[in-house]
């Protein structure tokens, strides 16, 4: 139930560290980690111990009945701008942290589809599972017209990529790619340790 998610009552225990890389977003030297079904608090502590040069921030989304894979719920587009699944909103107290650090969180556009494709058990919110190439360029699944339109209005160059047939393998564009190697150094994107 959503009450269990809001109360952070998950099926996982705290016996052993557990985390899924898909529950982690990199914001330069800051890592945003979703506490949920596939990442427990011991796993988050493990990340803190092993990534001492990064700030680790824990988030949760009470509107998500199955909190796994943060990239269909919360996605940074460029420094200062994040899209959030409007059905799984970041709680106000956690939003305040981003607001204080000059990050705007906006609702993602509604998915163009009412159901996933055949053999896919992922959420229709793979619509917001985008691949950011740089602060001006975003790859979006080609049939997700609502998301493409929103990003275009936000000033991004939108690159449509036909990828819906791959959803049955469990993810979208962000899930199916490794980190993009970028020129320059890893930046501190103005998030502070809380």
Which residue stretches match the model-derived regions?
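The feature marks the mature, well-folded catalytic cores of soluble enzymes
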Residues: 1-191
């Amino acid at each position: 139930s959503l009450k269990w998610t809001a109360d952070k009552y998950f099926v996982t225990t705290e016996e052993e560290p557990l985390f899924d890389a898909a529950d982690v977003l990199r914001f330069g030297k800051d890592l945003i980690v979703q506490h949920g079904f596939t990442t427990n608090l011991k796993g988050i502590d493990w990340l803190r111990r092993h990534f001492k040069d990064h700030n680790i921030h824990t988030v949760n989304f009470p509107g998500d009945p199955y909190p796994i894979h943060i990239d269909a719920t919360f996605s940074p587009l460029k420094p200062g701008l994040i899209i959030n699944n409007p059905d799984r909103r970041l709680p106000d107290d956690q939003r305040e942290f981003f607001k204080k650090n000059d990050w705007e969180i906006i609702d993602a556009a509604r998915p163009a589809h009412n159901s996933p494709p055949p053999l896919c058990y992922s959420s229709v919110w793979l619509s917001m599972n985008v691949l950011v190439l740089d602060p001006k360029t975003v790859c979006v699944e080609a049939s997700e017209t609502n998301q493409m339109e929103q990003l275009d209005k936000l000033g991004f160059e939108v690159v449509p990529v036909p990828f819906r047939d791959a959803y049955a393998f469990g993810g979208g564009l962000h899930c199916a790619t490794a980190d993009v190697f970028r020129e320059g150094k890893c930046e501190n994107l103005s998030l502070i340790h809380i």
